[in-house]
């Protein structure tokens, strides 16, 4: 028994447990009985493996719990902003910018949104925004002419505007709500209601009776003075209308067309708004044929906005249309989306009291209204309103003609082989107007236009322009003069052909001279070779005849009998006598 107890004690000591644990494993010997808690504490205290196992169990339980709690806390505190939204979808933002021909970088994107645009003091928040008003304010700072502009930020603000105007699905929930339309001010006095047969065009005042001419008119002459003669009045009924069933009133355009067909002799040709007798303006609306010709003989606004803008500018200057005519002109020549862009850009240019563009809605609605105003072109105030309206409309057309910045399209404009420098410069400026928001006539953009003009010219002009001394001090007109000089000094096709022929002739002469030298060398070598062979041939033996001497070359004897051949003297032989 004592041996078993000692063995158990030794085993307990080896496994790091208390000797009292022998009671739990069935030691029948006498000894103190310990409780389970005391035994567990003893195992925890003495066994390192037990402590390690318990710590691992506790850690495996606490780590997931803490991770879950931290994740819940972080997710509960994260706020999605326009800036973070664009960073989460950065690949789509870069693709959108690439489609517009520009490149953006994430680091600069963050810097501009959080710092530089905020410091412009135009209301841009640090977290970014998709509000078109804030984007427009930042654009004004970026597109400012001269040294106050920021051309390097153009790709980033254009990409912001693209995300706001053509938002993808992940941007739409963060767009600001549209502003409610501004209510029109109520007139102080009630306006008289228009009759059912009234037209949208202003009422033509009744002209005064014409003064009798000094000279009697020639009835046989078909000519009239369009600048001084009052046009014939519109036909009207003379006397009370006939009694009978009343027909519905026709539209003004249909009435004018019907009257023109019925009474062609009494109808005058439609002319622009101009002053008639007694300085009273006369008014004729646009004809359908004019609108059709303008639309069919000019490219669409989306294809060539500059050409259509120039056309509308000439129409506004020569015809001096009213507000209704301007709407009719825009509706005939532009699409719905293009009209909205033009009107939006025009309302941005409404001047305030200080002459700068204003943001006051009442001033904008009063100066450039979207609904038909009560402007009478017969009064100076009405004509002044129409003049300012037409100027703003032209500004809106030029603003809407600016496409997203695409410098790649500008770089593709290169000078043709036979194109003059002046024509190339005009095409280059047109590309700047069409594909960038910059004005090539602005002195602040002269450096970029000069670089494009130099590096995109034809190779011969480019090489000579780059070698000019003091190139930094040249203006665009100076470079154009130098390019014209280089272009005019170009050789004609006949001169080029003659130069090539002379060069080919010189090349042939040089080749002939080289071939002559080679042939002379070969002939000299052959001559030396023949000379050596002849020399060796002289030294060879000539065959002898049958009766010819090999020594003296004479015939009649052989060499052994030749008398000219020296003969050897015979040696004196001494005979020995054997007897001696």
Curated annotation (Swiss-Prot):
Subcellular locations according to the entry: Host cell membrane
Biased composition range(s): Pro residues: 174-193, 204-220, 230-245
Annotated TM spans: 52-72
GO biological process terms held by the UniProt record: virion assembly
Segments of skewed composition (Polar residues): 571-580
Membrane topology (Extracellular): 73-580
PANTHER family according to UniProt: GAG_P30 DOMAIN-CONTAINING PROTEIN
Name of this chain's protein: Glyco-Gag protein
Organism per entry: Feline leukemia virus
């Amino acid at each position: 028994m004592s041996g078993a107890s000692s063995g158990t004690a030794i085993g307990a000591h080896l496994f790091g447990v208390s000797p009292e644990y022998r009671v739990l494993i069935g030691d029948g010997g006498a000894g103190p009985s310990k409780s389970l808690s005391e035994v567990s504490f003893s195992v925890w205290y003495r066994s390192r493996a037990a402590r390690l196992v318990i710590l691992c169990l506790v850690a495996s339980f606490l780590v997931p719990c803490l991770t879950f709690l931290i994740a819940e806390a972080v997710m509960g505190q994260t706020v999605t902003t326009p800036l973070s939204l664009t960073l989460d979808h950065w690949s789509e933002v870069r693709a959108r910018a690439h489609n517009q021909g520009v490149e953006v970088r994430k680091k600069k994107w963050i810097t501009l949104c959080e710092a530089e645009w905020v410091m412009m003091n135009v209301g841009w928040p640090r977290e970014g925004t998709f509000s078109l008003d804030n984007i427009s304010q930042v654009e004004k700072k970026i597109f400012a002419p001269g040294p106050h502009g920021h051309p390097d930020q153009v790709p980033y603000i254009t990409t912001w505007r693209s995300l706001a105007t053509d938002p993808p699905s992940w941007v739409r929930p963060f767009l600001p709500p549209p502003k409610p339309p501004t209510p029109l001010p109520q007139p102080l006095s009630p306006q008289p209601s228009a009759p059912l047969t009234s037209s949208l065009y202003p009422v033509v005042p009744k002209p005064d009776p014409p003064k009798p001419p000094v000279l009697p008119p020639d009835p046989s002459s078909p000519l009239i003075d369009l600048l001084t003669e009052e046009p014939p009045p519109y036909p009207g009924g003379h006397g009370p209308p006939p009694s009978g069933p009343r027909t519905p009133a026709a539209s003004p355009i249909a009435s004018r067309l019907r009257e023109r067909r019925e009474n062609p002799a009494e109808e005058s040709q439609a002319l622009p708004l101009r002053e008639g007798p007694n300085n009273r303006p006369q008014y004729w609306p646009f004809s359908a044929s004019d609108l059709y010709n303008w639309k069919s003989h000019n490219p669409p606004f989306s294809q060539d906005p500059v050409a259509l803008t120039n056309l509308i500018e000439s129409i506004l200057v020569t015809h001096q249309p009213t507000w209704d005519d301007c709407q009719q002109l825009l509706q005939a020549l532009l699409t719905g989306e293009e009209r909205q862009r033009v009107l939006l850009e025009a309302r941005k240019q409404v001047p305030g009291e200080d002459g700068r563009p204003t943001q006051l809605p009442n001033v904008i609605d009063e100066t450039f209204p979207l609904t038909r105003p009560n402007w009478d072109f017969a009064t100076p105030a009405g004509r002044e309103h129409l003049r300012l309206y037409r100027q703003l409309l032209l500004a809106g057309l030029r603003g809407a003609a600016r496409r997203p910045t695409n410098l790649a399209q500008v770089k593709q404009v290169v000078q043709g082989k036979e194109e003059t420098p002046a024509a190339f410069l005009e095409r280059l400026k047109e590309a700047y107007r069409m594909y960038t928001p910059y004005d090539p006539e602005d002195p602040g953009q002269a450096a970029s236009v000069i670089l494009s003009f130099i590096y995109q010219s034809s190779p011969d002009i480019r090489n000579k322009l780059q070698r000019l001394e003091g190139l930094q001090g040249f203006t665009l007109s100076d470079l154009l003069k130098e390019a014209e000089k280089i272009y005019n000094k170009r050789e004609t096709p006949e001169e080029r052909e003659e130069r090539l022929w002379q060069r080919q002739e010189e090349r042939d002469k040089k080749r002939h001279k080289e071939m002559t030298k080679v042939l002379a060398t070969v002939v000299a070598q052959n001559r030396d070779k023949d000379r050596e062979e002849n020399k060796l041939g002289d030294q060879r033996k000539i065959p002898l005849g049958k009766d010819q001497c090999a020594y003296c070359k004479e015939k009649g004897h052989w060499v052994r009998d030749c008398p000219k051949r020296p003969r050897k003297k015979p040696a004196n032989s001494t005979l020995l006598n054997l007897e001696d």
